[in-house]
A protein has these predicted regions:
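N-terminal Sec-pathway targeting helices
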Residues: 1-15
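Hydrophobic alpha-helical membrane-insertion segments, chiefly the h-region
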Residues: 11-29
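Surface-exposed, glycine-biased beta-strand/turn segments
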Residues: 23-112, 145, 154, 183-194
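Extracellular/periplasmic catalytic domains that process cell-envelope and extracellular macromolecules
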Residues: 57-59, 76-77, 108, 120, ...
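Solvent-exposed loop/turn segments at secondary-structure junctions
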Residues: 72-73, 92, 106-109, 121-123, ...
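A generic structural motif
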Residues: 86, 117-119, 170-172
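Zn2+-dependent peptidoglycan hydrolase active-site motif and core
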Residues: 96-139, 162-166
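Conserved, short, structured surface segments that act as functional micro-motifs
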Residues: 123, 141-194
């Protein structure tokens, strides 16, 4: 029995010492879930909008039809930090809040996309896989909640047979540009309590 206990205990102790050494060497600024972490001073960010405070960004879609698509991968910083709202191609995409068009972009992943900055500057709303922008939509243009800004599509890496709006929300610190900020799950902001 003693021999069995030693054959189990010794390898277990070795593993524990090895883990302790790794933690000691890597220090507090490392995370096994996402690589390097920011151990510097935290920059204050704008508070997220209250739950249910945003307009639904696709015309004709009810709050009850929304599904939470937020996924975070425990092994990396990647995941799906958005909500996908399926709709027929060409369905109007609406601004979720009053704001200003910060950037119109065309990319491999998001395809035709819009970055809208909230009126207070503390939030970016990202609309992707758009078929096209609304006529005369331009960077710097003020938009109102519910205003048509684009149409649902399948541009970028969206599946050709599955048109949808990919919608993200990013909380911004003062001075951060449109591509920065911290992702916030948009589902509760759109869905709300009812």
């Amino acid at each position: 029995m003693k021999r069995f206990a030693l054959s189990v205990a010794l390898p277990l102790l070795f593993v524990l010492f090895a883990l302790a050494a790794i933690v000691h060497v890597t220090g507090p600024g490392w995370s096994m879930w996402g690589g390097e972490t920011d151990s510097g001073p935290q920059v204050p960010r704008a508070p997220a909008p209250p739950a249910g405070s945003l307009s639904i960004p696709v015309e004709g879609v009810a709050r009850a039809a929304l599904a939470d698509g937020w996924r975070v991968s425990p092994s990396s910083r990647h995941g799906h930090h958005a909500i996908d709202i399926p709709a027929p191609a060409g369905t109007p995409v609406l601004a979720v809040a009053d704001g200003r068009i910060e950037k119109l972009s065309e990319g491999e992943r998001g395809g035709a996309a819009i970055y809208e900055r909230s009126r207070d500057g503390g939030t970016i709303y990202f609309y992707a896989h758009l078929d096209h922008y609304a006529p005369a939509l331009a960077e710097g243009q003020a938009v109102s909640a519910g205003q048509v800004i684009a149409a649902v599509g399948t541009t970028g890496d969206a599946e050709a047979g599955a048109p949808h709006l990919h919608f993200e929300v990013h909380r911004m610190a003062p001075g951060e540009a449109w591509w920065q900020g911290r992702e916030v799950n948009p589902y509760p902001l759109l869905k709300g309590a009812g």
